[in-house]
UniProtKB/Swiss-Prot annotation:
Function: Acts as a sulfur carrier required for 2-thiolation of mcm(5)S(2)U at tRNA wobble positions of cytosolic tRNA(Lys), tRNA(Glu) and tRNA(Gln). Serves as sulfur donor in tRNA 2-thiolation reaction by being thiocarboxylated (-COSH) at its C-terminus by the MOCS3 homolog UBA4. The sulfur is then transferred to tRNA to form 2-thiolation of mcm(5)S(2)U. Prior mcm(5) tRNA modification by the elongator complex is required for 2-thiolation. Also acts as a ubiquitin-like protein (UBL) that is covalently conjugated via an isopeptide bond to lysine residues of target proteins such as AHP1.
Pathway: tRNA modification; 5-methoxycarbonylmethyl-2-thiouridine-tRNA biosynthesis
Glycyl lysine isopeptide (Gly-Lys) (interchain with K-? in acceptor proteins) cross-link, renumbered residues: G101
Any one GO molecular-function label of the UniProt entry: sulfur carrier activity
Compartments (UniProt record): Cytoplasm
Single Gene Ontology BP annotation: invasive growth in response to glucose limitation
Identification of the protein by name: Ubiquitin-related modifier 1
Listed CDD domains: Ubl_Urm1
Length: 101
């Protein structure tokens, strides 16, 4: 049992997922609820291609500073951050705000 969510990597962050920007991800759920914290763990296990790239995305068990996180086009800080309970069809957008130039 479980459900699907969409995960997007923008602003150059797609380099951690073999340059694939959009992913449909099945969230396994046997009982209870899944949160963004669970989603972050799932992303590190199933989307990030090279374990060396995990620190590009994660720092101190959460999304690293400099990455804007949107849940259904709303800043995740307004949605409860890691505690947000996932729902089928949710869209999670991770955008790097750190650019060279």
């Amino acid at each position: 049992m479980g459900f699907k969510v969409k995960v997007e990597f923008l602003g150059g962050l797609d380099v951690i997922s073999n340059k694939v920007r959009e992913h449909s991800l099945k969230v396994p759920l046997e009982e209870g609820e899944a949160t963004v914290k669970d989603l972050i763990e799932l992303i590190t296990k199933s989307i990030i291609a090279d374990p060396k790239d995990i620190p590009v995305f994660i720092e101190d068990d959460t999304v690293r500073p400099g990455i804007l996180v949107l849940i259904n086009d709303t800043d995740w800080e307004l949605e409860g951050m890691e505690e947000y309970v996932l729902e089928s069809g949710d869209v999670f957008t991770f955008t790097s705000t750190l650019h060279g130039g």
